[in-house]
Amino acid sequence: NNYQILKAENPILIGSIKVIPFLIDHSAFDSYCFFIEADGKKILYTGDFRNHGRKGKLTDKITGRLSKHIDAVIIEGTNINRIQEKINTEENIENEIIEKVKNKIGINLIMLGSQNIDRIVSIYKATSKMKKILVVDIYTANILATLSKYAKIPYPSSNFKNIKVIFTQKLCRKLELEGKKDNILKFSKFKITKEEIETNKDNIMMIVKNSMLEEIGNIKGIENGTFIYSMWEGYLEKSTALLQFLERHKLEFIKIHTSGHANNNFIMKFIKEINPKMIIPIHTNYPEKFEMFGKNVKVLNDNQEIEIV
């Protein structure tokens, strides 16, 4: 039980070490970077970050506040090998969804990570502008309802009447066996049935997961609809069931995605603006790409220690 709840910019003291969490832009909700002060040294650990999401201003704010004061930055480099002049923002994603499906006939299915809250907000905004119904499963509904206590997030409720919940048998059975029936019942007022989806399929945007495909496949009339894939393309290679589902139901396959991580251009800009004395790249398959910053880059192996002087 020895834990502390993080609050943005509230310092945490661990002996003589001070850690200040700063909210930062990332696809996961409530992401933080950490400013660490110890033995007179100042270290910034970025965590996973970007600036092209709905909270991009948070990342820009950090560079303004902490620049010129960093002895070392521990920085992620997931996309350091991706050099893009222009990167999709979440606002672009929202507009692209509208452009691709506004004149389509048939159901619209979209696959993404259920904890990619920025993306769900983009989908909700697009769905609302098209006056369509957004359908989510019980798992996603519970995540949204929980997080709505901490931020202005759309969730199945009387405040967001165009969000409905599909009660898939597989997940409902699992929750009942685990004694979590309340996680199902609290969304009863916002339930949408398979029959209602069939009747209104032209007006539906449904968030789906691989575990739902078998049940979704039993909905009448989903053939020739649209399937938007809003995830990292690398997952597709292992998604045999999904590829078979798409072929079986003759769904139009559309990719609309942007990464939860900063690209090469922004990583370079970020480092130049905070101007650290030392750069320690992590979370990357291409640490050598950081060598452009010269002698102050330290590429470390696992378990290797370094002294910041």
What role is predicted for each listed range?
Residues R82, K86-G221, I282:
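Hard-cation-handling environments
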Residues N2-A8, V165-Q169, K298-L300:
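Short acidic-hydrophobic, aromatic-tinged amphipathic segments that line or gate anion-handling sites
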Residues I24, L44-F49, V73-T78, N108-G113, ...:
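Active-site neighborhood of phospho(di)ester-bond hydrolases with catalytic His/Asp-centered motifs
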Residues Y3, I17, I70, I163-K164, ...:
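Short, conserved active-site loop motifs that form the nucleotide-linked donor/cofactor pocket
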Residues N1-D118, S122-S128, I133, Y150-P156:
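His/Asp/Glu-rich metal-coordinating catalytic cores
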Residues K129, C172-V309:
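C-terminal regulatory/interaction regions
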Residues P21-I24, K41, Y155-V165, N275-P281:
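A polyampholytic, Gly/Pro-enriched intrinsically disordered region
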Residues D25-F29, N51, G113-I120, T140-N142, ...:
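Gly/Ser/Thr-rich loops at beta-strand to alpha-helix junctions
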